[in-house]
Amino acid sequence: MKNTFIWILKIFIGLIALLLLKTGFMWSFLPETNLEAHNIVTNSNLGLNMIKSEIGSGLFSVALFLLLYVIKGKKWFLPATIMVGLYLVTRTISFMVDGYHPVIVTLIVLEALILVALFALNKLQSK
């Protein structure tokens, strides 16, 4: 019975993860389509909620994983690296597609430096 429940939960969480991957792709690479499909205007209640939820929670997640890695150690290296790496990849692709802005370049450099620092710390701690 316990194993059945474990599998049901894994399937449920896996399906949610797939839905979130699709949603993340849509917001990252087709935001206009997503805004139009859901009738989201950025200065409406829904628009503000989406900005706060999608952007705010993503940044909170990155910050939390970075802090957990620094405080709690190696088991948080992979989540922190993946989160920062996804921000860097998405921002770089968006930069190539949508064009230049000095803030974008600053954030790309900062995210790359964070990744370098994560890998350097991981390497130093494994010696």
Where are these regions (language model features)?
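Membrane-interfacial loop-to-transmembrane alpha-helix junctions, especially the N-terminal start
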Residues: 73-83
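Core segments of alpha-helical transmembrane spans in multipass integral membrane proteins
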Residues: 46-67, 82
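Hydrophobic, membrane-inserted alpha-helices
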Residues: 58-66, 87-91, 114
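Cytosolic juxtamembrane helix and N-cap/initiation of the first transmembrane helix
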Residues: 1-19
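Hydrophobic transmembrane helix segments
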Residues: 17-49
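Membrane-water interface at the C-terminal end of transmembrane alpha helices
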Residues: 113-127
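Aromatic-anchored segments of alpha-helical transmembrane domains
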Residues: 20-23, 83-93
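Membrane-helix boundary connector in multi-pass membrane proteins
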Residues: 76, 89-105
